């Protein structure tokens, strides 16, 4: 061991923790550990505080005081330093250096530690010594047996340390005393070891010394655990004394002032004060990594103070071992790597199965025998399996675990701090123990000039520097004025900060309920000046500040125990909870007090006056958000008795689930607590009989008990009717209606007869009450004691509970619902009084057979019947009640099957609609009731299918008679208010029509399948159409496009306009609100309810809502709020299914059924919520039905279904009648479609159409008039009442004539079914849509396109797109031209004789626009997507594809003009047509504009270099011009199969196209039309032919001058740039006046990242190396392509084909992308490779990129195959030649071209943006974050360059240089981390360049019209905006001047733009097509005019 090592002990007793450190050589013989050695901690959260004794002595030499290296400098404050070290060093060093490190649990008890120190004994040095008991005494005291063992000499040799001794002795002691507790075992072992060491004959040896030390350690631990609670001194006995330490160390310190320091303020980074701290350690501290702590049995290793090992080399001790641990340079690490940055969790290898403290011994130095032991505070066996082995240690408690014993088990030790599952559960946070130790080590360097100070450099409160007061127990520092209350002066003596003195919380906080400002603390008076004038009054004490206090609920305690906790306590003990609360709540203003009683203030004030207890509770609890119910006892569910005989009760609180039940003491002062205890014991006695444990005061006399319980034998005959209601009912205070009494009699009679029954009264007649009274009567009359099982929908369970309380007060009713935990508690405590009647735990187990059931009634939901069937199925039930029993209508449902397996004596089913759909369901109900009688479904159905109606009814009546009772409200309540149902027909809104048509078109195939569509798909279509009738926002697409508010809710206006129903609802609700009615709104779709919520919020109505997701308690609360007198809620939103069950909302008198259910019964269920007992007003029911839609048809079918199936007697109704036949579905779907598609044809005058329903105020008033009796639809009225007449008493069948009438009408409709209906209606829409889809598929996997509901289903809208734009804005530029004007259909018809075709015309069912039919419009769009905008002379060029050839120039130009105008029309893409009524045909502005823009950039780039690079990529392949002239001047491209379509045209433009190739798809990369495929095959078949045909140069007129002579070739023209600026990264690229020569082709022309070996795996995705960012900014001279000019070795490389062409053509090409893409990096590498290998053609580089772009200009976007087949671009094929024999060669090649083009496209877009930024003079404000980043980068660069030499010098061994290098590296690291932080913040601060329209302050349209006249040219406005991408005549010279005025805002300073900068560079993602904003046309179209000479040196601004 090194001299510096200390032995540290941990001892735990029950109440205290103690940590002792003392020099290893020193044993208790010398002296007692004084108060600084032993610190007592009250509480289990032990804070470890250590004090250093002197260093360990070498061998047996007497201990000297520590030797310091540099004494002189320290002498003056030596004593203070020692003192400080004693007091606070360990406390202060437990933290990381970082100021932010929070001190977790350590702070807590420092205060107590200090105050509880023991007072010094008599005198300074002499301490009272206490006898240590011998092992024999201890054993005697504890009554244990001693071990007889005589130690041999060998024992003394082998048992050299405590560990070995303990392993030897422990089993012996355990054998004698098998049940000995661990603590006693340890104490005895310690005593034994002490005696063993004392008797050791070999004492003098080194081994003995070490052994003695370990013994002392163990002894102290043991003595402490035994005796420390009494805190009496302990006397040592034992090994020989070592010399005591020098007196100086023991002297009491002089009084001193508390420690202060000068802080450096928040920004300052701390540096270690010690120059000798090795680098590795610094790194560790910087990262705040705790050291790796592995405990491995007996590995040789050296124990450092910090609790880690550093394994030591065998060479022997280091020379400086005594001086300092730190100097050895070893860092805490078990693995031996000094600088491992990340540590793994500490592991410990225990001895198998032994439980003991672990003392590790190890030889200190090779060759020496000395062994020292140390003890860790962790157990060395696994907590779970109690075995040893390799275990990991918890950082927050002494437990240890195997990795595999954890749950979930771990594969490897976790890194960093780790807390065990126990601590996690108890909420203990880790203690930074290792850091503490780590820093102690650092602090202990002997030669340090000044003490290591770990206190924070800034004040913990204000985060500022200055003179700070440092805590003696932790690293916190404070200004004295920041404390609360502020201190007037620095205090004397030791000072502890508020965190260290913060009291511990009384438990774990469950949640924070409220906060408030507390009282400010009392001020500290200023001390009197000693020399001051006594007359001068003392300064006024500084006032404290108020601090926040939090009202908290504790885990495991009830709300009665809630109390206030200080903010500091929460911050320390519950940091995460505190932070979350802070984040979610306003921490400046306390939350408003919530008068939890929920009543308005007036009522609660009155109540407070009357009830002082309530006032007190309000004051103390209720106003902080605690509901009174939560503090009200619901019932006591169990009791327990502690050792002292005190009773504790498990209390279930009202309105809280069972898992929040809490144990309360007997004496708790809770209202009604006594009564509940009384009833608990009384019920227990009833069930269990006499209980000896029962407290005497609760014991009842036998007689009293009998009154409570049921009679032991039946008191009357259940078959005898009650004429008046029985006494036990009257006692409850309730009165039954006569019909309910009849029901009760009938139920009792059936019970007596053993007949299971269905109670089928109509809704609202009180089936629940009749059932409860029936069960209660059975109990009270002694027929049965239960238990009864009631299964009901979750929503009605609360209602059942209430009714049971009311009508059956003596029943013990348990509600079995809730989560797993709640149900586990119910099973354990509520199923039986016997303790282990049922196994505990979350899984449900069977109940023991003989166990007595504790409850009378168990209420549960359907789901739990199936989920917990193990527990529930094991009980024998006297009666089962199923509420809403139509859940059993399907015998396949799990509920049916599970319930069938329960043991049940009697069954009662309740349902308001017994015969919902058909006989089959009725049969299943009967089958469930009496399976032995009803078990043949087929027989049953047949029997009732073929007899006449009368017989059927009679027979069914006889069959059902005994089992079913049904009464109607109409029969029972003659005076109940009437109800009127109206069907309200509503129009579809335009948006709904669009979606409706789309759905039909999209599903054309399903509708039209000859075998009749599959039923499921038809139902799906129907569902979609129903959604559409409700609201288009139910489709995700529409919802995405819809306008929203910042809160995420839909914007009200648009929401209402989009749906016909909402428009009507808006008007109705306003009127209803005025008239004071209240409304229930039912919808089947919960999403629709969401929309209705947004609608009601927008309209400002208060509402409640219930749907399937809102469960029992919340439901009932909502209902109660709505029904409360004077409630503000105006509407109640319900989902039809969830809201139809047992809910009473009789306070509302208007029901709106927003969408009808398929099943009319569900709707009846729904409106019966309002029309029920308790309703005082007439009920109006409005059923919204969309006119001419599936809804209207469904309503008709449903009416029929009501009539027929309600009778349960219609022939042929068998099983299938309930579900709709395909025929019916088809009929429903057809309904109204013809009219819908016809609608558009009438054009604009639809509003006047008489069939359109328009609701004005008058109509609404009529609709809401409650006096109308006649329903427009009398039959509906009658239907609904219809067999609400299945009375068992009398069957009445009314209105049979009407029934037949309706049937007939429908059957007639069914007869004349047109088999081709869908074919005629939808075929062409469908085909059109398929074309659209194919076009939009693009390449690769189709991105699911937004559902384009507007396209497809209209004849006149052949191919509309999901990206439609519609706008009412007039187009000012085109108004004067008739073809541009918006014209009515009539005008158009009259203009047919005019030369231009009309704007819109219908020809043979197809719409034509300006004479262009669908196919031609599609062809035109395809051409645009292929070549960009048509050039000026497009009509005379090959741009005009085959489909458009028939058009005159005028028509063509007019259409181009119209197309452009539509492109620029602002507005959402959602509308069906453009502003002028032209259908939007799949036109996505964004895509088209993007494509036009990209093609424009490509064309311009190619034109820029075309005159230098010529037209042929390999001029040697150029065909002989003489041969060429014989061919037609309009050569077809090689893709044409025959060369013979010579439609000559006078002038060819550079963007020639091949007329014969079909148009590509929009993103035509992947899909080719069949024609293309054919061509492609032909191309492969006939390569020779193609090469023969050759390819003529595009325009002979413009053919490049013959290749220059050799001399000329070597010197391409160099034209100087106007503004050459050396670019700083991030500065503006100068804009040359002449782009052709604008830059040298970046450094060199760049090489093939793919040689021939791999032409495909591009490096496009490499990130740009840092140094190269500037390489484009540094504008190199424009030298053409010098590096590319071949040396002599390349010269004759012309593939041997044309020897005569020896000179290389000139070549020049560049894209100035500012380094924002990786293009230039690629080019550099590729060119390097190409030049060095001489394979200029075979390695892809800059030259190939140019020709790729040229090919795209000629052949169109992504026509890779055409380009490869064109001889002009032969160079593109060169790099792939070596791959040609591979299987996937073509695909590989095309993929590479596509990827490469994406990169070029990206670079072009960025270049364009840079140009715009320059043009706009955009510059960045210096204060902007982007500039800070820029400055930091420059700083880093400068720093790096200026210190390059250091690394060489440092390596050469120059130590100062080494130190400086480290400093520089640290600075660099800081700079880089700052830059990293800046970069992460950047995106938020960046904004985009405003759209061009905003920058020019012009609308898109006016920009477009300006563009029509390019520059200053005088020619008149042409009939369409000229193709802005055609080259202006002067292109290539300086650009034409910008038109005056067009650029008004051009000079706008960047500072006027929206804040934020514009740098978003795609440097590391794959190249993506940079999406343009809507400005694309504007901005790119205006390229010609958007230019001017740039300013130099400005910041690059990019709009990505």
Curated annotation (Swiss-Prot):
Provide the cross-link position: Glycyl lysine isopeptide (Lys-Gly) (interchain with G-Cter in SUMO2): 120, 163, 295, 302, 627, 721, 1222, 1238, 1246, 1308, 1573, 1585, 1876, 1988
Q: What is the residue range of the motif DEAH box? A: 883-886
User: Which UniProt keywords are present, listed alphabetically?
Assistant: ATP-binding, Chromatin regulator, Cytoplasm, Cytoskeleton, Disease variant, DNA-binding, Host-virus interaction, Hydrolase, Intellectual disability, Isopeptide bond, Metal-binding, Nucleotide-binding, Nucleus, Phosphoprotein, Repeat, Transcription, Transcription regulation, Ubl conjugation, Zinc, Zinc-finger
**One GO BP:** negative regulation of transcription by RNA polymerase II
Q: Where is the composition biased (Basic and acidic residues)?
A: 78-89, 1377-1395, 1562-1573, 1579-1595, 1608-1617, 1632-1706
Enzyme's top EC category: hydrolase
Question: Spans of biased composition, class Low complexity?
Answer: 1530-1550, 1622-1631
Zinc finger motifs (PHD-type), residue ranges: 379-426, 456-503
Give the residue ranges for region: Disordered: 23-133, 231-359, 431-452, 523-542, 587-611, 692-721, 1349-1399, 1513-1707
User: What disease is associated with this protein?
Assistant: Snijders Blok-Campeau syndrome: An autosomal dominant neurodevelopmental disorder characterized by intellectual disability with a wide range of severity, developmental delay, and impaired speech and language skills. Speech-related problems include dysarthria, speech apraxia, oromotor problems, and stuttering. Additional clinical features are macrocephaly, characteristic facial features such as prominent forehead and hypertelorism, hypotonia, and joint laxity.
Q: How does it assemble?
A: Component of the nucleosome remodeling and deacetylase (NuRD) repressor complex, composed of core proteins MTA1, MTA2, MTA3, RBBP4, RBBP7, HDAC1, HDAC2, MBD2, MBD3, and peripherally associated proteins CDK2AP1, CDK2AP2, GATAD2A, GATAD2B, CHD3, CHD4 and CHD5. The exact stoichiometry of the NuRD complex is unknown, and some subunits such as MBD2 and MBD3, GATAD2A and GATAD2B, and CHD3, CHD4 and CHD5 define mutually exclusive NuRD complexes. Interacts with CBX1. Interacts with CBX3. Interacts with CBX5. Interacts (via its C-terminal) with HABP4. Interacts with HDAC1. Interacts with MTA1.
The record's annotation in PANTHER family points to: CHROMODOMAIN-HELICASE-DNA-BINDING PROTEIN 3 (PTHR45623:SF9), CHROMODOMAIN-HELICASE-DNA-BINDING PROTEIN 3-RELATED-RELATED (PTHR45623)
User: What name goes with this protein?
Assistant: Chromodomain-helicase-DNA-binding protein 3
Q: Which organism is it from?
A: Homo sapiens
Name of the gene: CHD3
């Amino acid at each position: 061991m090194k001299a510096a090592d200390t032995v540290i002990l941990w001892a735990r007793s029950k109440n205290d923790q103690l940590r002792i450190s003392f020099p290893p050589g020193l044993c208790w013989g010398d002296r007692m550990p004084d108060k600084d050695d032993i610190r007592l901690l009250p509480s289990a959260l032990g804070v470890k505080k250590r004090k250093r004794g002197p260093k360990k002595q070498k061998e047996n030499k007497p201990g000297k005081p520590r030797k310091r290296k540099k004494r002189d400098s320290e002498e003056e404050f030596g004593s203070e330093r020692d003192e400080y070290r004693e007091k606070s060093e360990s406390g202060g060093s437990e933290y990381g250096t970082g100021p932010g490190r929070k001190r977790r649990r350590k702070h807590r008890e420092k205060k107590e530690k200090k105050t509880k120190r023991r007072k010094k004994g008599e005198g300074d040095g002499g301490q009272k010594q206490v006898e240590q008991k011998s092992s024999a005494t201890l054993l005697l005291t504890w009554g244990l047996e001693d071990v007889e063992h005589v130690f041999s000499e060998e024992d003394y040799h082998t048992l050299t340390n405590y560990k070995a001794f303990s392993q030897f002795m422990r089993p012996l002691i355990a054998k004698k005393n098998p049940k000995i507790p661990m603590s006693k075992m340890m104490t005895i072992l310690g005593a034994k070891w002490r005696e063993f060491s004392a008797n050791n004959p070999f004492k003098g040896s080194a081994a003995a010394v070490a052994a003695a030390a370990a013994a002392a350690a163990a002894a102290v631990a043991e003595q402490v655990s035994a005796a420390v609670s009494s805190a009496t001194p302990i006397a040592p006995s034992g090994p020989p004394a070592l010399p005591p330490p020098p007196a100086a160390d023991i002297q009491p310190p002089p009084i001193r002032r508390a420690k202060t320091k000068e802080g450096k303020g928040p920004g300052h980074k701390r540096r270690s004060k010690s120059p000798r701290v090795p680098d590795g350690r610094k790194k560790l501290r910087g990262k705040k990594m705790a050291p790796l702590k592995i405990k491995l049995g007996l590995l040789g290793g050296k124990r450092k103070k910090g609790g880690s090992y550093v394994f030591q080399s065998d060479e022997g001790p280091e020379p400086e071992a005594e001086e300092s641990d730190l100097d050895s340079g070893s860092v805490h690490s078990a693995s031996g790597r000094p600088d491992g940055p990340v540590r793994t969790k500490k592991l410990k290898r225990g001895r198998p199965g032994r439980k003991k403290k672990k003392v590790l011994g190890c030889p200190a130095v090779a060759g020496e025998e000395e062994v020292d032991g140390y003890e860790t505070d962790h157990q060395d066996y696994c907590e779970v399996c109690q075995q040893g082995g390799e275990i990991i240690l918890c950082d927050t408690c002494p437990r240890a675990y195997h990795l595999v014993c954890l749950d979930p088990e771990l594969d490897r030790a976790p890194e960093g701090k780790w807390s065990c599952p126990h601590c996690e559960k108890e909420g203990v946070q880790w203690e930074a123990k290792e850091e503490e130790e780590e820093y102690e080590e650092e602090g202990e360097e002997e030669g340090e000039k000044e003490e290591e100070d770990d206190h924070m450099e800034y004040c913990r409160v204000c985060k500022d520097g200055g003179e700070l007061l440092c805590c003696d127990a932790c690293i916190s520092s404070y200004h004295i004025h920041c404390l609360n209350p502020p201190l007037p002066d620095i205090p004397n003596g030791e000072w502890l900060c508020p965190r260290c003195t913060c009291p511990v919380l009384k438990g774990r906080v469950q949640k924070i309920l409220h906060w408030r400002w507390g009282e400010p603390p009392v001020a500290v008076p200023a001390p009197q000046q000693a020399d001051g004038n006594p007359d001068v009054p003392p300064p006024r004490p500084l006032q404290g500040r108020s601090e926040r206090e939090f009202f908290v609920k504790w885990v495991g305690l009830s709300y009665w125990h809630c109390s206030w906790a200080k903010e500091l306590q929460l911050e320390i003990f519950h940091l995460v909870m505190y932070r979350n609360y802070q984040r979610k709540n306003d921490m400046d203003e306390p939350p408003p007090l919530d008068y939890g009683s929920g009543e308005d203030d007036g009522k609660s004030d009155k109540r407070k006056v009357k009830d002082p207890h309530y006032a007190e509770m309000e004051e103390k609890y209720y106003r902080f958000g605690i509901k009174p119910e939560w503090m009200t006892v619901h019932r006591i569910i169990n009791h327990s008795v502690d050792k002292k005989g005190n009773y504790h009760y498990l209390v279930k609180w009202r309105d809280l689930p069972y898992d929040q039940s809490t144990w309360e003491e007997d004496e708790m002062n809770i209202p009604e607590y006594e009564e509940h205890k009384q009833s608990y014991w009384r019920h227990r006695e009833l069930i269990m009989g006499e209980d000896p444990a029962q407290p005497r005061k609760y014991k009842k006399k036998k007689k009293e008990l009998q009154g409570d319980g049921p009679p032991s034998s039946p008191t009357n005959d259940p078959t005898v009717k009650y004429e008046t209601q029985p006494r036990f009912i009257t006692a409850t205070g309730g009165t039954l209606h006569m019909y309910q009494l009849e029901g009760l009699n009938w139920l009792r009679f059936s019970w007596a007869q053993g007949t299971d029954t269905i109670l089928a009264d109509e809704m609202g007649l009180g089936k629940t009450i009749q059932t409860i009274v029936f069960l209660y009567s059975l109990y009270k009359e002694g027929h049965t004691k239960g238990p009864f099982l009631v299964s009901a929908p979750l929503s009605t369970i609360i209602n059942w509970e209430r009714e049971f309380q009311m009508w059956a007060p003596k029943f013990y009713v348990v509600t079995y619902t809730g989560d797993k935990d709640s149900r586990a508690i119910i099973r354990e405590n509520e199923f039986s009084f016997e303790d282990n009647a049922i196994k505990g735990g979350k899984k449900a187990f069977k109940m023991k057979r003989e166990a007595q059931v504790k409850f009378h009634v168990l209420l549960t939901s359907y789901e739990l019947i199936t989920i917990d069937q193990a527990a529930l199925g094991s009980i024998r039930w006297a009666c089962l009640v199923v509420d809403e029993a139509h859940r059993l209508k399907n015998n396949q449902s799990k509920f049916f099957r599970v319930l069938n397996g329960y043991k049940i004596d009697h069954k009662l089913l309740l349902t308001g609609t017994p015969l919902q759909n058909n006989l089959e369901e009725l049969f299943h109900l009967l089958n469930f009731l009496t399976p032995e009688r009803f078990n043949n479904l087929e027989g049953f159905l047949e029997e009732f299918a073929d007899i006449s109606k009368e017989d059927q009814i009679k027979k069914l009546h006889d069959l059902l008679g005994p089992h079913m009772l049904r009464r109607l409200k109409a029969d029972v309540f003659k005076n109940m208010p009437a109800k009127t149902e109206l069907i309200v027909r509503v129009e579809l809104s335009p948006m709904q029509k669009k979606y409706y048509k789309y759905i039909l078109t999209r599903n054309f195939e399903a509708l039209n399948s000859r075998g009749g569509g599959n039923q499921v798909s038809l139902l799906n279509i129907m569902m979609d159409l129903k959604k559409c009738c409700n609201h288009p926002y139910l489709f995700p697409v529409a919802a995405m496009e819809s306008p929203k508010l910042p809160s995420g809710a839909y914007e009200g206006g648009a929401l209402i306009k989009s749906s016909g129903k909402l428009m009507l609802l808006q008007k109705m609700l306003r009127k209803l609100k005025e008239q004071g009615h209240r409304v229930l709104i039912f919808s089947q779709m919960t999403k629709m309810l969401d929309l209705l919520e947004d609608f009601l919020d927008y309209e400002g109505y208060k509402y409640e809502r219930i749907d399937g997701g809102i469960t029992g308690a919340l439901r009932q609360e909502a209902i109660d709020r709505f029904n409360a007198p004077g409630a503000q809620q105006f509407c109640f939103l319900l989902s039809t299914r969830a809201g139809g069950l047992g809910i009473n909302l009789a306070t509302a008198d208007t029901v709106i059924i927003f969408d009808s259910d398929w099943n009319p019964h569900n709707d009846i269920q729904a409106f019966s919520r309002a029309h029920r007992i308790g309703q005082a007003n007439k009920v109006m029911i409005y059923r919204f039905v969309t006119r001419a839609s599936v809804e209207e048809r469904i309503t008709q079918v449903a009416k029929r279904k009501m009539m027929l199936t309600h009778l349960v007697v219609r022939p042929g109704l068998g099983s299938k009648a309930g579900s709709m036949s395909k025929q019916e579905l088809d009929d429903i779907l057809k309904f109204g479609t013809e009219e819908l598609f016809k609608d558009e044809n009438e054009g604009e005058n639809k509003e006047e159409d008489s069939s359109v329903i328009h609701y004005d105020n008058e109509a609404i008033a009529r609709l809401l008039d409650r006096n109308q009796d006649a329903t427009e639809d009398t039959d509906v009225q009658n239907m609904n009442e219809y067999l609400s007449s299945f009375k068992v008493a009398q069957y009445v069948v009314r209105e049979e004539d009407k029934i037949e009438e309706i049937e007939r009408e429908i059957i007639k409709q069914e007869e004349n079914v047109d088999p081709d209906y869908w074919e005629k209606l939808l075929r062409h829409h469908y085909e059109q849509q398929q074309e659209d889809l194919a076009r939009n598929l693009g390449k690769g996997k189709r991105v699911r396109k937004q559902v384009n509901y507007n396209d497809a289903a209209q004849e006149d809208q052949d191919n509309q797109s999901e990206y439609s734009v519609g706008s009412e804005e007039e187009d000012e530029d085109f108004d004067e031209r008739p073809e541009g004007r918006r014209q009515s259909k009539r005008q158009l018809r009259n203009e047919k004789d005019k030369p231009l075709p009309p704007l819109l015309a219908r020809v043979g069912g197809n719409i034509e626009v300006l004479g262009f039919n669908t196919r031609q419009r599609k062809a035109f769009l395809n051409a645009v997507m292929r070549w960009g905008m048509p050039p000026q002379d497009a009509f005379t060029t090959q741009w005009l594809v085959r489909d458009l050839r028939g058009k005159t120039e005028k028509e063509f130009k007019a259409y181009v003009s119209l197309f452009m105008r539509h492109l620029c029309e602002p507005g959402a893409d959602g509308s069906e047509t453009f502003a002028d009524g032209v259908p939007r045909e799949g036109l996505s502005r964004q895509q088209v504009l993007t494509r036009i823009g990209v093609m424009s950039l490509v064309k311009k780039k190619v034109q820029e270099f075309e005159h230098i690079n010529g037209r042929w990529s390999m001029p040697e392949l150029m065909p002989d011009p003489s041969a060429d002239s014989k061919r037609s001047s309009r050569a077809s491209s090689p893709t044409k199969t025959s060369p013979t379509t010579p439609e000559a045209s006078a002038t060819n433009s550079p963007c020639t196209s091949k007329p014969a190739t079909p148009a590509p798809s929009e993103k035509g990369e992947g899909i080719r039309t069949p024609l293309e495929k054919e061509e492609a095959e032909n191309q492969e078949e006939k390569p020779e032919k193609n090469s023969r045909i050759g390819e003529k140069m595009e325009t002979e007129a413009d053919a490049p001058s013959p290749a220059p002579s050799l001399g000329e070739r070597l010197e391409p023209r160099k034209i100087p740039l106007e503004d050459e600026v050396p670019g700083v990264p991030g500065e503006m690229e100068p804009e040359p006046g002449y782009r052709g020569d604008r830059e040298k082709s970046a450094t060199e022309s760049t090489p093939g990242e793919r040689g021939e070996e791999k032409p495909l795996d591009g490096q496009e995705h490499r990130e740009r190396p840092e140094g190269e960012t500037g390489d484009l900014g540094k504008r190199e001279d424009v030298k053409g392509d010098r590096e590319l000019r071949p040396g002599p070795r390349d010269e004759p490389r012309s593939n041997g084909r044309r020897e005569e062409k020896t000179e290389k053509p000139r070549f020049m090409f560049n894209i100035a992308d500012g380094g924002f893409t990786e293009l230039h990096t690629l080019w550099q590498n590729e060119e390097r490779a190409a030049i060095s290998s001489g394979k200029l053609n075979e390695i892809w580089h800059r030259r190939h990129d140019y020709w790729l772009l040229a090919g795209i200009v000629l052949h169109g976007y992504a026509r890779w195959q055409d380009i490869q087949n064109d001889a002009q671009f032969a160079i593109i094929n060169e790099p792939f030649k070596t791959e040609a024999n591979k299987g996937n060669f073509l695909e590989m090649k095309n993929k590479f071209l596509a990827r490469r083009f994406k990169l070029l496209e990206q670079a072009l877009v960025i270049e364009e943006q840079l140009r715009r930024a320059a043009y706009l003079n955009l510059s960045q404000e210096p204060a902007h974050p982007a500039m800070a980043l820029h400055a930091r980068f420059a700083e880093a660069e400068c720093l790096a360059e200026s210190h390059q030499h250091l690394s060489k010098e440092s390596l050469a061994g120059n130590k100062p240089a080494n130190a400086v290098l480290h400093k520089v590296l640290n600075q660099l690291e800081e700079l880089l981390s700052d830059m990293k932080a800046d970069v992460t913040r950047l995106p938020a601060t960046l904004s985009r360049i405003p759209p061009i329209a905003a920058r020019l302050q012009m609308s898109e349209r006016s920009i477009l019209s300006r563009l029509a006249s390019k520059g200053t040219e005088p020619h008149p406005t042409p009939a369409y905006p000229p193709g802005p991408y055609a080259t202006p005549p002067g292109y290539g010279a300086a650009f034409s001047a910008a038109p005056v005025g067009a650029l008004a805002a051009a000079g706008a300073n960047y500072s006027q733009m929206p804040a934020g900068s514009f740098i978003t560079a795609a440097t590391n993602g794959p190249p993506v097509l940079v999406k343009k904003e809507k400005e694309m046309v504007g901005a790119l179209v205006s390229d010609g005019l958007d230019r001017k000479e740039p300013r130099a040196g400005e910041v690059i601004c990019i709009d990505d």
